[in-house]
Amino acid sequence: MSREESVSGANDVSSLYPPPPPYIKYFTSENVEKLKEYNERREEGESAENELDFLIPPPMPSSGSYRAFGSVWQIKDHLPDLETMGITQLYKKTSEGEAEVTDYQYKIKELRRLSYSLLLNFVELVGVLSVNPELYESKVENIRTILVNIHHLLNEYRPHQSRESLIMLLEEQLEHKKQEVANIELVCQQVTEKLKQVQTLLKESQSQSQSQSQSQSQSQSQSQLQSDSQ
């Protein structure tokens, strides 16, 4: 393969919508049917390299990284230091910062300081452009370094932001469940009161019916006595 073809292939892999890999042509219905028998032969150690190997999922990465779409990705998400990337770090590390504040508070303080520095350098850049535009490079480089440091600090702050967002979500869910429980208790209380009212009405109706039956029986007995006396 020539150098031009190699560069072209690398560009294809790392493009926004990369084309299908070349081994996609081996994913046919016929090969899928042969795969089970081929796996059995592989377990027995009787098979050599075959195009059916492309149908077998790759093993888990044994190292701490893997390659996908022309880039190397770390299995464990780790944010590298700016110094390892060759960029000047404008803020102290947390262990070197103020001891009386927490980690995220220190990051907030440094973000504010870098934001002020960014505004100051922008004003200085405008002044340089108005006096001698040829001297802009150093100020632009300073602004770039400040922006990279701000972006790096924001990325370091994201774990705390995720925890706080999760806490807020759980608190909202807890408050919602408490409100639902309160609504259920209110409905149960209303149902209990209605049942008590129904029971009271039933008792009153039963007592009224009993009194009516007693009065009727008394009137009947009196009429019977009167008829007997006559």
From Swiss-Prot:
Q: Identify its protein family.
A: Belongs to the Mediator complex subunit 7 family.
Which Pfam families does this chain map to?
Med7
Which molecular-function annotation in GO is an example for this chain? transcription coactivator activity
> Taxonomically, what lineage is the organism?
Eukaryota, Fungi, Dikarya, Ascomycota, Saccharomycotina
The family database entries (SUPFAM superfamilies) matched by this protein are listed as:
Mediator hinge subcomplex-like (SSF140718)
Q: How does it assemble?
A: Component of the Mediator complex.
Q: What does this protein do?
A: Component of the Mediator complex, a coactivator involved in the regulated transcription of nearly all RNA polymerase II-dependent genes. Mediator functions as a bridge to convey information from gene-specific regulatory proteins to the basal RNA polymerase II transcription machinery. Mediator is recruited to promoters by direct interactions with regulatory proteins and serves as a scaffold for the assembly of a functional preinitiation complex with RNA polymerase II and the general transcription factors.
Task: Supply the source organism for this entry.
Answer: Candida glabrata (strain ATCC 2001 / BCRC 20586 / JCM 3761 / NBRC 0622 / NRRL Y-65 / CBS 138)
In this chain, the stretch annotated as Disordered covers: 1-22, 206-230
Recorded protein name is Mediator of RNA polymerase II transcription subunit 7
Where found in the cell? Nucleus
One biological process term in Gene Ontology: negative regulation of transcription by RNA polymerase II
Keyword Nucleus recorded? yes
Q: Which UniProt keywords apply?
A: Activator, Nucleus, Transcription, Transcription regulation
Gene Ontology CC annotation, any one: core mediator complex
